[in-house]
């Protein structure tokens, strides 16, 4: 499922109004807002609607497909606003380093949605769906790391045991 309208019609965003209402946008300074786990872009699109044209919005997601879909949606939302937007394909663990790369040293607001995207469950080939058959992958970025299938089928029992005990 990669049709944006189909995805938006199926997804229900949690705490959307509460989050957006809780963030105060200053009109006398540049607001820099970071969405550290973009996911389904609802929070980001509502936040951009609220921001000033001179503000900066930075969004992170380790899943490149989420970023590609979100870019399309957020370009629509931002076409009249002209908020400066930065798309970063990285995990929020790298937030400080990634922000430094784009010369951002201080932020106004940051928020995290520490769950996974419903896309990961809805599409069997995306990540890990327990509702549909699909490859055993379990990577947010399919260009990095080994698949879960590669690990399960090539690691020694002792290595697998160590992974399961550690994580």
Segments predicted by a language model, with ranges:
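S-adenosyl-L-methionine-dependent methyltransferase catalytic core, i.e., the SAM/SAH-binding region
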Residues: 1-167
């Amino acid at each position: 499922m990669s049709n944006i309208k189909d995805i938006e019609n199926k997804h229900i965003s949690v705490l959307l109004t509460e989050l957006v209402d809780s963030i105060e946008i200053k009109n006398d300074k540049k607001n820099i807002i970071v969405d550290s786990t973009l996911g389904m872009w609802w929070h980001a699109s509502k936040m951009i609607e609220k921001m000033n044209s001179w503000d900066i919005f930075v969004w992170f997601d380790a899943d490149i497909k989420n970023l590609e879909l979100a870019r399309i949606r957020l370009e629509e939302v931002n076409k009249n606003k002209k908020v400066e937007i930065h798309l970063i394909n990285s995990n929020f663990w790298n937030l400080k380093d990634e922000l430094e790369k784009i010369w951002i040293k201080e932020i106004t607001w940051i928020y995290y949605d520490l769950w996974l995207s419903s896309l990961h469950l809805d599409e069997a080939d995306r990540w890990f769906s327990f509702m549909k058959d699909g490859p055993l992958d379990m990577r947010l970025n399919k260009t990095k790391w080994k698949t879960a299938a590669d690990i399960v089928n090539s690691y020694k029992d002792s290595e697998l045991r160590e992974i399961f005990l550690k994580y």
